[in-house]
Amino acid sequence: MARFTARTNADEPPITELQLATLVTEAPEGIEWLHEQKFDGYRILAELDRGKVRLLSRRFKDWTSEFPAVAEAVSKLSAESAVLDGEVAAVMPDGRTSFQALQNARSGARLSYFVFDLLEMDGEAVMKLALEERKARLEQLVRKSPGVIRYSDHVLGSGREFFQLACKQGLEGIISKRRDKPYLPGRGPTWVKTKCMLRQELVIGGYTDPEGSRTGIGALLVGYYEGSELRYAGKVGTGFSHALLEELRALLVPLECAASAFSPEPPRAWTGSGRHWVTPTLVGEVAFAEWTNDGRLRHPSFQGLRKDKRAIDVVRETPEQAGTSGTSAKPKPTKQKPAKPRATRR
């Protein structure tokens, strides 16, 4: 039985990198794939060690104090030690998860920790096992846990039909995973994601003054890194609450600088007048319809700040064509009918 690697320093994260999904244009088919709902929240790695709990962000920052209810629930699991991978998200009354609601304590949404993988349990390196076995053990571990921890269920095969159903229900998209593979840190072909609407993180490089009755800011000027150069991606002027407009202004004014960080500097015809450049340290998530031919966002809408992402890591996401991300060129047929996408099973 493989054992989990010992660490010389207790403050070190239990693994060097999380497994990440590659964006694709089409969900894979075939019984070798299982499909899960894509949650709209913060990726969190939960580490349990003899009753003590540590919650780590995607970049392994200690976020235990951010989600005390999650930490308490993890501490009550029936294991001496465990490492769980999942996503903390706010669940709306209609069952969908909302990143905006997660950032707004007054949204009325309830907080849940959706767990979809088990990396270690009682000293055993479960991450070396096939995903299907890991999920079976995970479900056993959390089935009697407090309601804040929720098991992320899945369906087998029929990925495209499952994706279409997810989009009809207003979900962000789906994650498809090879059921026979171990947990492989980094971004690779055994986990792929298909999105109903394009969304990605973008760096805030400036803002414009508000007009009319609007307060705070008018719009955000955003971009992404291409090598060491920050490329302009567009102007985001929708998706803000009044409180968020004021919060953004308070964050951006201290970051103002004389020169644009964008290369090349966008013309005023693209940004509008009354623009202010800022040091590009803040990252936001933006939903949009498509990329235009000149590399700008079409119909963008702001979704929220991403304090779990570094600006320098933000690049333009380009989906791979089906068949180039570990998907089979000739999908294997499956007799199993797709289940409706459920948020979770307790």
PLM feature spans:
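Catalytic cores of nucleic-acid ligases and guanylyltransferases
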Residues: 1-346
